Each structure stands twice: as C-alpha cells, then as structure tokens.
C-alpha cells in the first residue's frame, strides 16, 4: 500500500470517529427536518406577519389622527397671523394719525406758547434777578421748560419701535411655518407609502389569514390592539403646554374697557407739582432776596424739569395768573392725548398677538417632533413587513429552509459548535443563520428560535424611508 493511500484511509477513519462530517443517515435526517421546519415555520411566520400588519394598520390610523390635529394647528396659526397683521395695521394707522395731529398741534400752539411765555415773563419780571442772572437765559429756561413739559406729557417710547415686528421677522416666521408644513407632508407621504407596501404583503398572504383579521385590516375601523403595539421608549419627552382651546378670541375685544389715560395721570402730576410750589412759605421779597435764590422744588416733584427748581420756584407761584400755561395743550390739541393712549393700546395689542402666534407656532413644532418620533418608533418595530412586498409573489411557502449543514470552527475539530441554515420568507433572498448547539433540531423551541432570528434579520436590514 502506498503511503499516500494509507494516509487518506487513516484520515477518513478519523473523520468517522470524530463525527465531524455528517453521515448518510445524518444528511437524510437533516433533509427531512428541513421540510418539517418549513411546514411548522409557516404557522409561526403567519403570526409574526399578522402582528406586524396590525402594527402598520395602527401606524396608519395614528398618522391620520395626527394629520387632523396638524390641520387644526395650521388653521389656528393662520388665524393668529391674520390677527397679528391686523393689530400691526391698526398700530400703524393710529401712529400715523398721531404724527399728523402732533404736526398740526405744533403750528396751532405757537400763539398759545407765546401767550404763556409772556404771562410768565411779566409776572416773573420782579424776580428776574433771582430767577436768572440775565433775562435772555430766563427766556431760554422757560422755552426749555415747555419742551420738557411736552416730552413729559407725551413720551412715545422709542424702544417700543424696536419691539414691533418687522418685515424680516415675518419672513423668518413664514419660512419656519413652510418648513414645518413640508416636513409633515413628507412624513404623511412616507407613512402612506409604507402602509401601501404592507397592503401588498397582506394581499399576497390573504388566504393565510382568518376572516376577522381580513375584515379588520381592510376596514377603516379604529380597532386598537395594545398587545401588538410597539414597545416604545419609556424616556420622558417634553411636551408643550396645551392651550385651553383652538378658538382664538378676538383680540380687538381685549381692551374694550381699557382705562389707561395719559391725560389724567400727567395732568394730576403737573397740578400736584405746581400746588407744591404755590404752598411754599411766603417770604418778604424786599428783605429775603438772598434766601429766595436757595429755594428748590421738593425732590419728589422735580421730574423732567427739576433743574429749574432752584431759581424759578418763586416765578412759578404765579402760575394761577397764567392758567394758559396749564391748559393750552388741552384746548388747542384735544386729540393728541387720546391718540397717545390709543397708540399704547394698539402697541399692547400687537405684543399680545405676537406672543399668541409664537405660542401656537411652538406647539405646532412640538407636535411635528412628537409625530416624527412616534412614527419612527412604529416603523422600526413593524416596518420590516413592508420589505416583503419587494419580493415576487407566488411563493409556495411563507417560510422556507433550503439547506442545513453543520459548521466546523476553524482550528477546533473536536466538536460541532453550531449549525448553518439557509432561510427565506416568502420569496425573499436566502440568508444564513447560525444555530448554536444548545438550540439543536431536537429541541422544542428550535422553530421559534429560527423565526425570531429571521425577524431580527429583516428588521436589521430593513431600509429606512
């Protein structure tokens, strides 16, 4: 016997003793098991596919609910935008009217201002040495006094102009709304497409399902199946504060009884200030000229014209003789105080409408994020079944196992660690599973184990939308 033939014979005997290669009986048993696996697997795969189809049905129903909520939010957002634009339009109209009235007021007040200044000048003539060192500076002081009084009476807050919504703000908000709408619409299309693919799978396997399930899946009835819903993440998610109702009240009724009045508040302040000056202790003018120069207005009444208190306190105690100085604004410009009040009200209206719009916009954004999160979780759990629609119809079996051979680990010829099985669901391409030794064909849960691994394979390789 040649040495090479001897070595080959010894090698075959060694393989037989080690059971590293399957015997003819083993191969026959494996082939029989494959047929049994396919038949038993059809039953289990049927249930898994049914669960996934129910999940896809619930995904469709939930998306339809979310779509209706999104539509209501967008309608509310549109209404808020219209209210905000109307408030801004009103604000601009009132402000424009105020500017016109103030311009006319400046012209009509020229004579009144001259009368007031003349009255003060004549009554303060005897005190001009104490009021100011020179008469020219006295006139300048009186003119400055009137300018400050007018600014104090009608202070239009320049900062409010910065707070008003500008064109860039509207453009930014419109772009954000358009993006939300586009993302939600795309999500709706994706969910419908995924469900339609699942519907194709249902039609391929329709004869495998009972009549109750067929009726449910093809109907629009919202039949919740909590046992089949996905186990979504239990991590808490932040929710936007819900509004009381989608109905937005008319903003133009909020300030119907608005009682702010600049005229009354400022008029009261001026009256108190002048009365405080008038109540100063009367001094002997001939003997107390020096002391008069040291008189000052009370600190709390200096206001915007407190700088005139030191030397003009005695001059202004004659304001009763110059009532024109106190009433000229109300007589010649009666609409200006009211218009300032309306401007403040309109500005407040703009701010409230802007805040309301921002609140609804934030709710819409949160609603989109929550919907996307929920649909993604359901897609991850059930979407794999839609991938079966890519396979050609007409497969005889739902679940096929085409080949099962022992696997020998490299470098370890002493034992069989796992079995290699080629599987397919419907007409999907074959994929290979490695079955560990403890999950052998003789164990009762072998089919369940293979099916679980097959479903995991589909989920892992499921294409994202």
Swiss-Prot record:
It holds the Pfam family Clusterin. Residues 62-106 form a coiled coil. It is found in: Secreted. Disulfide bonds join 105-333, 116-325, 119-322, 124-315. GO terms for molecular function: misfolded protein binding. Glycans are attached at residues 196, 257, 285, 311, 351, 412, 430. Retina-specific (at protein level). In the light-adapted retina, expressed in the outer segment of cone photoreceptors. In the dark-adapted retina, strongly expressed in the outer plexiform layer in the region of contact between the cone pedicles and second order neurons with little or no expression in the cone photoreceptor outer segments. InterPro entries: Clusterin-like, Clusterin_C, Clusterin_N. Residues 1-20 form the signal peptide. It comes from the Eukaryota. One of its GO terms (cellular component) is extracellular space. Keywords: Coiled coil, Disulfide bond, Glycoprotein, Secreted, Signal. The keyword Disulfide bond applies. Belongs to the clusterin family. This is Clusterin-like protein 1. It comes from Canis lupus familiaris.
